Design a protein with these regions (language model features):
Chain B
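Short, well-ordered loop/turn sites that connect or cap secondary structure elements
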Residues: 43-44, 49
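Active-site/ligand-binding-proximal alpha/beta "capping" segment
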Residues: 114-115, 191-224
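Feature captures the catalytic cores and cofactor-binding loops of soluble hydro-lyases/lyases
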Residues: 57-186, 223-224
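Short, charged beta-turn/beta-strand-edge "cap" motif at the junction between a beta-strand
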Residues: 48, 54-58, 194
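Short, surface-exposed secondary-structure edge patches
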Residues: 37-42
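Short, structured beta-strand/loop micro-motifs enriched in basic residues and often containing a Trp
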Residues: 26-35
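N-terminal amphipathic/hydrophobic targeting modules at extreme N-termini
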Residues: 9-12, 22-24
Length: 281, 224
């Protein structure tokens, strides 16, 4: 049985998601910021956390973006194998939604092409689209705008398997430490372990989509997440980099099988403006 | 998990006149552009400051063009003497609004241009976020200038402090155009002062915990 979803529906949905993701900070992030405010000991750190909470309230009330860097439109698709897309090409429909959402929603356009010495494309397209074919007859679309400041502080490495969990931990800590105040802490740190060169980066990015406060289902990985968070919060960078206990709100790790010769690790740094909104059609 | 919090007040002191570097924010200082040397001399890393007056918004591409003009010995589209540049690429304004969200962008990308601009124009301040290079920090000391950070990600809040915004050059750059902004009580924090004070370094000295708890490196089913 095939189910038909039209390109128009998809475009409308993507446009709405672009606006919503940029205007409304998720409840999980707001909750985490409030929790951080209670635990932060640094007065300057508290001041930053208060400003971020106030900022989220203003953005929602005025329907303006939480952050002026409304990012690259990263779009995740979970496309049911029984879905048939009609009325055009799926990726054109997604890009039309991004164009509409960013233009009509007064969001900043940040895409430049060609990458060396290029010009602003003017409508924030092209989106970066990741498609996964899944069982069923539904299409789930997640729009996750990703800012440049935090993305620039991200990193990947191909460790030797002998480096083990200690090597993973050292790389994550080194990446966060090196980033310092640049990616607008408090952070959400997405870590991908395993797979290969490109897979670990995608795992790290997907780790950022998990709601804050939800640990990895495997206890060993959940423990690694807790340990990494504690170590990161010992660095002292603090909110805004002004010093304090809260450098990260959460660490999310995602894993995949790896080659016997490699232990790939990627760290995708996310600022507090952790934006992602989903819809299932 | 057990670990020790260091006692407060561990920030290093030295003979530097910036003796309260890294101290918790107390009372806000108010400044108005253009800045005289005396105003800059009164600012210390860690101070919370409210900025009012005209400031200029410029980022990557606008900086490149400004420095190219200096290289060719041509006049800049704006006199930067005593002025502040804000590293921002604002979101578009909704109808009836002055500007869209307008938080700081990462300052380090402007490092290659900043010392030149300070020396050639008399620029006195920059607002952004994140680390500066040692060359920039030296230029701040040599020319009595100051680097502030605004709160990254607080773009909607900061937009409320902006009362007027005009594109004054490079409209082809879109969000990267050179803007004139009139601001009122824009909240910023002094990161690098004209005495070599550096809040980011002082903050780490004050708040980092050296005894990072040891990981329980137990068996990890997914990694072994």
């Amino acid at each position: 049985m095939t189910r038909i979803i039209t390109c128009d529906e998809i475009t409308r949905a993507v446009a709405d998601l672009c606006r919503e993701a940029n205007y409304y900070l998720g409840k999980d992030v707001r909750g985490a910021l409030e929790g951080a405010l209670a635990r932060e000991v640094s007065p300057q750190g508290k001041d930053v956390l208060n400003q971020l909470l106030e900022n989220a309230a203003i953005a929602a009330a005025e329907e303006v973006p939480i952050c002026q860097d409304t990012g690259v439109a990263v779009v995740f698709l979970e496309l049911g194998q029984e879905v048939q897309v009609q009325g055009g090409y799926l990726y054109d429909a997604i890009n039309a939604g991004v164009r509409q959402g960013y233009t009509e929603g007064y969001l900043r356009k940040s895409m430049v092409y060609p990458p060396l010495d290029g010009r602003n494309t003017g409508d924030n397209t092209p989106a970066i689209i990741h498609t996964e074919i899944v069982p069923g007859d539904k299409l789930t679309i997640t729009v996750a705008p990703k800012g440049g400041g935090s993305e620039n502080m991200s990193a990947a490495v191909m460790l030797a398997p002998a480096a083990g969990i200690r090597g993973v931990k050292e790389f994550v800590l080194e990446t966060v430490k090196k980033a310092g105040p640049n990616p607008c802490p408090p952070l959400i740190v997405g870590v991908g372990i395993g797979g290969n060169f490109e897979k670990c980066a995608l795992l790290a990015k997907k780790a950022l989509l998990r709601p804050l406060g939800e640990p990895h289902p495997l206890e060993g990985i959940a423990a690694l997440e807790r340990d990494l968070l504690e170590s990161i919060n010992c660095l002292g960078i603090g909110p805004g980099g002004f010093g304090g206990r809260i450098t990260a709100l959460a660490v999310h790790v995602e894993i995949f099988a790896r080659h016997i010769a490699s232990l790939p690790v990627a760290v995708n740094i996310q600022c507090h403006a952790a934006r992602h909104k989903s819809i299932t059609l | 998990m057990k670990f020790k919090y260091p006692s407060r007040g561990t920030a290093p002191m030295d003979s530097n006149p910036a003796c309260r570097r890294g101290a918790p924010a107390t009372e806000d200082k108010r400044i108005r552009t253009p800045l005289e040397d005396a105003v800059v001399e009164d600012l210390r890393s860690g101070d919370r400051v409210l900025v009012s007056g005209v400031i200029y918004a410029a980022r990557d591409s606008a900086h490149k063009r400004l420095v190219e003009l200096l290289d060719r010995g041509e006049e800049l589209p704006v006199d930067l003497k005593g002025q502040i540049i804000y590293y921002v690429g604002p979101a578009p304004a909704r109808p009836g609004r002055v500007i869209g969200s307008a938080g700081p962008t990462t300052s380090g990308r402007m490092d290659p241009y900043t010392p030149r601009l300070i020396a050639a124009t008399g620029l006195k301040g920059m607002i952004g976020k994140g680390y500066r290079s040692s060359e920039v920090k030296k230029a701040l000391v040599d020319h009595k200038a100051v680097y502030f950070a605004a709160v990254g990600g607080a773009g909607a809040l900061i937009a409320r402090c902006i009362k007027r915004a005009e594109v004054i050059a490079y409209p082809d750059l879109g969000p990267e155009a050179l803007h004139l902004l009139e601001v009122e009580d824009l909240p910023v924090t002094v990161i690098n002062d004209c005495y070599g004070g550096d809040l980011y370094t002082e903050a780490l000295a004050r708040y980092s915990i050296k005894e990072v708890p040891e990981l329980p490196l137990g068996k990890d089913p997914a990694l072994s």
